[in-house]
Amino acid sequence: MNIYRTHTCGELRGSDVGKEVKLSGWIHRKRDLGGMLFVTLRDNYGITQVLANPGTDAYKVFNDTRIESVVTVEGKVLSRGENINKDMPTGEIEVEATSVIVQSAADVLPMQVADDDNAPEETRLTYRFLDLRREKLHNNILLRSKVIAGIRKRMIEMGFTEFQTPILTSSSPEGARDYLVPSRLYPGKFYALPQAPQQFKQLLMVSGFDKYFQIAPCFRDEDARADRSPGEFYQLDVEMSFCTQDEVFEAMEKLFVSLFTELAPGAKVTGPTFPRISYEQAMNRWGCDKPDLRYGLEIEDVSDIIAKTEGNFLKGAIDSGKAVRAICVNNVGDKSRKFYSNLEAFCKENGAAGLATLIYTDTEVKGTVTKLLNDEVKAELKERMKAQSGSAILMVADEKLKASVILGKLRIKLADELDLREKNAFRFCWVNDFPMFEKDEETGQTIFSHNPFSMPQGGLDALLNQDPLTIKAYQYDIVCNGIELSSGAIRNHKPEIMYKAFEIAGYDKSVVDEKFGGMIRAFRFGAPPNGGIAPGIDRITMLLANEQNIREVICFPLNQKAQDLLMQAPAEATEKQLKELHLKIVE
């Protein structure tokens, strides 16, 4: 028999009235009403109201004990009668305390637990163990556990096998800075913490395993963002042998539709398949490679219509080789001039020369360019953009991609301001056909645009005969509600193709052999075609929890400066430790 409790704090119901029970938990709140002391007791499972009568030992102990102290309460379950609290699962009952034992007394709290008091992030992270007691954050972490358990169950049901890959490995050029671990036995040499288990999961396919998955920790020395935690993160790492891109898509669609339907009951979830959007389409129609499909405002190229006009700056832009692209916003015909001037200022902040507007009403067409365009052009624009009375067509003239990117940012701003996003919905899509290479803006060098291990479309022939910037890769992202959940690819499993791809990106054969020698050697002994993907656990949970910041779904995250305020990391090493590792700190 458990000496601390007979029931949890979320367990008792009306059917338990009259029972003698024992509960243990944290003192959540205390209220003195007419001499009667009411205490809410909290544990992992819920809250139960406890009452202590004046003059009793229980009353004295509760009265002398601070909020958030841990206590064990013995007492009798009573009915609340007509005073039921319908907001609590245990709201039909209360426990009349006959004995209270303090298991651990709390000091004065540096932050409130029972109330969301908007404590500074520094305080929350320094006292994360208190922060994690708060209901919302506590539930987020429990949801994260359900996400991982649900993923594991479904992956096994689909025939995948779970593996564990090394944490200490070698450094590789995968796009972010490595965390390095100095070797004690080999002076001057370092291990690296894996940015991802990329090489190991491909080696498992070469080893004859068929379907791999792992809830994998990944380590990248990169700056924080709202949707990216510095230091480390977890991903569902997946790899499949003898698969095509479509088969990877099918497995992930099955996983996500089922998982989100279970963990977000009542929500609208895209399915059973997800729309497929090429990278080029995404940039042209949404102005980014992470389209949010919960609202419209798709970008259209209206250059052909504007080209029919004369003597205006829009036509001048087209004549100089630029494009005019547009979005249509409904129900904004009555917005003030300031509303539109703010939109133009936003576009200018993001690199536009200006924002051209046409505002359609029942009787006229207003806006900054209405006098520059004839009635036929305005009517054609209205038809192309599916505008109606109260709609506004917003146009940017610039280089094709730049115009789309500016409008892409504008559509996000409008969705925020006008509350355009579909509620309680998870709208998934695939973005595929990414470019294999891109130009580095600073150096002008050709570099990999995404995953260097991807198979180029067209294989070795494309690498030998095409302009590298025109080559597409078998790369794909899964996006939900404008958030990239994962990147994936069909892998390059042929050494000759890998050498050529890295050569184009500026890597000598000797560098490839040094950095990826283990994988290259393996590929010379028979490697199956393989592909995979790696959705982020943190971002999946963030979506399901409806959180805007990824730190709200991680137990012990680093702060924006990559510091662990609770454990005081990073910390200085001792002279003894440095000596053992053959290191010296140089000022």
Residue map of PLM features:
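Class II aminoacyl-tRNA synthetase catalytic cores and aaRS-like
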Residues: 1-587
